[in-house]
């Protein structure tokens, strides 16, 4: 290898970004070919193409000019597993890992050179996780896995800025949205639900509809959330299909036992504090939260009056997953508030 003068730090960073943009785009192309020709799935193919093209916009001539393939000591390195791909699943798994690792590298090194690229890589990485689940798991398994990992859950409230607020929260990392609207006409609800579903899909978040199984079906939602006075869960599954999520609100041990017997995919636990979202409902406090933590086999989302001023109390009481309404819907900066709520929930995780 020819001895060259040491490259500047900026030059080295550009080489790292160039190499990993190449790696991510190549891996996505391999995955896209199977989505297109193997699965013949137009939606998954379009998602792969959008991911590739989004990365391509950041793969500038400046980054390409930093490339020094003949001086790269890594080009001669290989591993036996790279030469052995015995099954289709092995090919897909290897290329998903390749893309995810490359995006993480871009995210971290992009913080030093291009914060927009870094944030984009982070968002794309989560979309790739969803894509992998769609290809390697059945739809219900994929949704359940995503639900299990969702720390924060936004239940919407009517607002003239609804889409703007929800998108800001999604940019902040929100993994789960429930559309709740008790007053609008059905045409408005369906139109809004479809807009929210498209937003959630773009950011790789789950989307549920409150109460209305028909709206959930019409909007292609990931599932529905039922209250105690709504239709039986089995009927909801018959209408929606067995691959969708169904959650249930609970306020006491008897309601929790019913939800467990029905096979709820998750439960809401609350209201922890008094809240105008549920007027006339007495706060259940932390005793029921701790009971649910001990007895419920499915994810439990603490809900009711939770915000930045009291979330640490809720975490100390045992909650690991939290649902909020006003904390985000009424926030001056929904994106920053979402990030802070997620940060505190992450800090509260058991080590």
Swiss-Prot record:
Where does this protein hold Mg(2+)?
Answer: 211, 230
Keyword line:
Magnesium, Metal-binding, Thiamine biosynthesis, Transferase
Named from the GO MF annotations, one term is: thiamine-phosphate diphosphorylase activity
Extract one GO cellular component term from the record: cytoplasm
- Residues that bind 4-amino-2-methyl-5-(diphosphooxymethyl)pyrimidine, according to the entry? 178-182, 210, 249, 278
| EC number assigned by the record | 2.5.1.3
Question: What reaction(s) does this enzyme catalyze?
Answer: 2-[(2R,5Z)-2-carboxy-4-methylthiazol-5(2H)-ylidene]ethyl phosphate + 4-amino-2-methyl-5-(diphosphooxymethyl)pyrimidine + 2 H(+) = thiamine phosphate + CO2 + diphosphate; 2-(2-carboxy-4-methylthiazol-5-yl)ethyl phosphate + 4-amino-2-methyl-5-(diphosphooxymethyl)pyrimidine + 2 H(+) = thiamine phosphate + CO2 + diphosphate; 4-methyl-5-(2-phosphooxyethyl)-thiazole + 4-amino-2-methyl-5-(diphosphooxymethyl)pyrimidine + H(+) = thiamine phosphate + diphosphate
Where is the stretch described as Unknown?
A: 1-127
Q: Which HAMAP family match?
A: TMP_synthase, TMP_synthase_cyanobact
Listed name of the protein: Thiamine-phosphate synthase
């Amino acid at each position: 290898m020819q001895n060259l003068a040491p490259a500047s730090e900026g030059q080295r960073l550009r080489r790292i970004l160039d190499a990993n943009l190449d790696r991510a785009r190549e891996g996505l192309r391999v995955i896209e070919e199977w989505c297109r020709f193997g699965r013949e799935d137009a939606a998954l193919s379009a998602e792969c193409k959008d991911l590739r093209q989004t990365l391509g916009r950041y793969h500038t001539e400046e980054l390409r000019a930093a490339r020094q393939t003949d001086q790269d000591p890594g080009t001669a390195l290989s591993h036996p597993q790279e030469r052995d791909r015995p099954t289709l699943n092995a090919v897909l798994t290897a290329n998903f890992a390749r893309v995810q690792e490359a995006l993480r590298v871009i995210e971290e090194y992009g913080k030093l050179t291009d914060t927009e690229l870094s944030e984009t890589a982070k968002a794309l990485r989560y979309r790739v996780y969803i894509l992998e689940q769609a290809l390697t798991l059945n739809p219900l398994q994929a949704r359940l896995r995503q639900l299990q990992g969702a720390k924060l859950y936004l239940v919407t409230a009517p607002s003239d800025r609804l889409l703007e607020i929800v998108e800001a929260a999604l940019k902040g990392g929100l993994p789960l949205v429930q559309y709740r609207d008790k007053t609008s006409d059905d045409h408005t609800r369906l139109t809004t639900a479809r807009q929210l579903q498209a937003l959630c899909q773009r950011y790789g978040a789950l989307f549920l509809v409150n109460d209305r199984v028909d709206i959930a079906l019409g909007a292609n939602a990931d599932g529905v959330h039922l209250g105690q006075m709504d239709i039986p869960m089995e009927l909801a599954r018959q209408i929606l299909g067995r691959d969708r999520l169904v959650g249930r609100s609970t306020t006491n041990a008897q309601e929790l036992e019913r939800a467990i017997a029905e096979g709820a995919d998750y439960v809401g636990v609350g209201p922890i504090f008094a809240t105008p979202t549920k007027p006339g409902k007495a706060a259940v406090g932390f005793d029921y939260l701790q009971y649910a933590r001990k007895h419920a086999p499915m994810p439990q989302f603490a809900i009711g009056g939770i915000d930045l001023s009291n979330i640490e109390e809720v975490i100390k009481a045992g909650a690991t997953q939290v649902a909020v309404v006003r904390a985000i819907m009424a926030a001056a900066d929904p994106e920053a508030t979402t990030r802070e709520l997620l940060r505190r929930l992450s800090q509260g995780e058991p080590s």
